[in-house]
């Protein structure tokens, strides 16, 4: 889990999904599992009661997820999308195109927070080596990516 002071960057959609999930956990699943525990207790001896043990395990899982989501929602920052025409500096939320200086491969991606990362759909974490290299830079700049095998890319588009 990230440090208390560390910002957790989320898209507006992810933020809404976390809010909805938290509400579902608190208002639906938590009461259900409490009822399951009550029913299992009524079956008598708790020392060999598989239903009771399963309900308690389920309760622990739900409570852990609630705690994790509450932490996220206590430390989030919504990624602002860049809509104006004067977009020039790469930041979290930017759509970026770079070209590898090694083999002229073009890479298109959006920089998102770690919880929204989806590399198969072109969304990379702001903590990834490529994102770290381009954040704060402008189109036209050449940057070195600090990866196990360092490489250079030229930023060709920021949007």
Curated annotation (Swiss-Prot):
Pfam families with a match to the protein in the record: GreA_GreB, GreA_GreB_N
Coiled coil: 47-77
Biological process, per Gene Ontology: DNA-templated transcription elongation; regulation of DNA-templated transcription elongation
GO-annotated molecular function: DNA binding; RNA polymerase binding
Assigned keywords, A-Z: Coiled coil, DNA-binding, Transcription, Transcription regulation
Top-rank taxon: Bacteria
Record carries keyword Acyltransferase: no
InterPro entries cross-referenced by the UniProt entry: GreA/GreB_C_sf, TF_GreA/GreB_CS, Tscrpt_elong_fac_GreA, Tscrpt_elong_fac_GreA/B, Tscrpt_elong_fac_GreA/B_C, Tscrpt_elong_fac_GreA/B_fam, Tscrpt_elong_fac_GreA/B_N, Tscrpt_elong_fac_GreA/B_N_sf
Job of this protein: Necessary for efficient RNA polymerase transcription elongation past template-encoded arresting sites. The arresting sites in DNA have the property of trapping a certain fraction of elongating RNA polymerases that pass through, resulting in locked ternary complexes. Cleavage of the nascent transcript by cleavage factors such as GreA or GreB allows the resumption of elongation from the new 3'terminus. GreA releases sequences of 2 to 3 nucleotides.
Family: Belongs to the GreA/GreB family.
Protein name listed in UniProt: Transcription elongation factor GreA
Origin species: Metamycoplasma arthritidis (strain 158L3-1) (Mycoplasma arthritidis)
Upper classification of the organism: Bacteria, Bacillati, Mycoplasmatota, Mycoplasmoidales, Metamycoplasmataceae
């Amino acid at each position: 889990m990230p440090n208390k002071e560390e910002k957790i960057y989320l898209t507006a959609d992810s933020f809404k999904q976390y809010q909805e999930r938290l509400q579902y956990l608190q208002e639906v699943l938590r009461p259900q599992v409490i009822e399951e525990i009550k029913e299992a207790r009524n079956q008598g001896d708790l020392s060999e009661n598989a239903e009771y043990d399963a309900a308690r395990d389920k309760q622990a899982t739900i409570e852990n997820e609630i705690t994790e989501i509450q932490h996220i929602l206590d430390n989030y920052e919504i990624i602002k999308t860049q809509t104006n025409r004067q977009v020039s500096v790469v930041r979290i939320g930017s759509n970026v195109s770079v070209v590898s200086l090694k083999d002229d491969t073009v890479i298109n991606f959006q920089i998102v927070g770690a919880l929204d990362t989806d590399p198969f759909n072109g969304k990379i974490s702001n903590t990834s080596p490529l994102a770290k290299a381009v954040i704060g830079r402008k189109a036209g700049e050449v940057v070195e990516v600090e990866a196990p095998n360092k490489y250079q890319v030229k930023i060709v588009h920021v949007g």
